[in-house]
Curated annotation (Swiss-Prot):
SUPFAM superfamilies: RPB6/omega subunit-like. NCBIfam families: rpoZ (TIGR00690). Keywords: DNA-directed RNA polymerase, Nucleotidyltransferase, Transcription, Transferase. Its EC number is 2.7.7.6. Belongs to the RNA polymerase subunit omega family. It is an enzyme of class 2 (transferase). GO terms for biological process: DNA-templated transcription. This is DNA-directed RNA polymerase subunit omega. Disulfide bonds: none annotated.
Length: 101
């Protein structure tokens, strides 16, 4: 079991309130497997891993903002590609049904 000193993690972030917000955001990423842990998992829960990452200075609020922004851009690109793909399928289906009829 990992020992995490909340005070050390709070000192890295600035205060306990921002620590809770940052740790919750990071733990959610880890829980949903959106991002891989930056420290060994050691059979710890996502919240403990998030706190360990913060304590080591690997994660903070601005890093979380950057990660979430890049994830949002990646998601938007994937959605646009899916829309384009579906539009192509519909166009081709219409073309073939028009030429067959």
């Amino acid at each position: 079991m990992a020992r995490v000193t909340v005070q050390e993690a709070a000192d890295k972030i600035g205060n306990r309130f921002d620590l809770i917000l940052t740790a919750a955001r990071r733990a959610r990423q880890l829980q949903l497997h959106v991002r891989e842990p930056l420290v060994p998992e050691e059979n710890d829960k996502p919240t403990v891993i998030a706190l360990r990452e913060i304590e080591k200075g690997l994660i903070n609020g601005s890093i979380m903002d950057q990660l979430e922004n890049s994830d949002a851009v990646r998601q938007e690109v994937a959605e646009q590609e899916a829309i384009s793909f579906l539009t192509d399928i519909q166009t081709n289906a219409y073309f073939y049904s028009f030429n067959d009829g």
